[in-house]
């Protein structure tokens, strides 16, 4: 379905029409870094490729020594992989996501967002214990989720946790 297109399906018939004036496409940056499925095509490349490239660019600015690169699942996966590959570092799933909990950053209250993080993520202790970690996330909206994740990693035995954001602007 294209921008401004209406697709109508009735009586086993598919009709498409564009009742609105054609306007220049102005995508939201969050389509590239968060909302789009990794296999969505955006400007001729998959969202996965865009996100992985952001991780590579972030790695070019890195000045921190770490044992492992850990993504905030699932939104930070591709960027963390690009980051790790560019630096030749180990990519590890130091956080395990419960896929039955939805997106936490769009919840209406801080209390619900905090509870959502606790239900959504668990630290993978055997992977992170005594490790210096670079934690990669796609973006930073409020910072409350990142704060809770960092605490979770330290509580699970991480030696150091450094947070890097793939799309900070």
Q: Which residue stretches match the model-derived regions?
A:
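PRPP-associated nucleotide enzymes
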Residues: 1-169
């Amino acid at each position: 379905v294209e921008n401004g297109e209406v697709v109508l399906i009735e009586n086993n018939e598919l009709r498409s029409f564009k009742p609105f004036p054609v306007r220049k496409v102005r995508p939201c940056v969050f389509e590239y870094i968060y909302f789009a499925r990794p296999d969505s095509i955006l400007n001729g490349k998959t969202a996965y490729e865009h996100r992985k490239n952001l991780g590579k660019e972030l790695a070019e600015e890195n000045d921190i020594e770490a044992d492992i690169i850990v993504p905030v699942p699932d939104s930070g996966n591709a960027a963390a992989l690009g980051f790790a590959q560019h630096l030749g570092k180990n990519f590890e799933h130091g956080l395990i996501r419960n896929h039955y909990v939805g997106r936490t950053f769009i919840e209406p209250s801080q209390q619900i967002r905090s509870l959502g993080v606790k239900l959504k993520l668990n630290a993978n202790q055997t992977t992170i214990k005594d490790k210096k970690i670079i934690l990669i996330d796609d973006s930073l909206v409020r910072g409350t989720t990142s704060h809770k994740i960092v605490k979770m990693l330290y509580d699970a035995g991480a030696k150091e946790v450094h947070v890097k954001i793939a799309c900070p602007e």
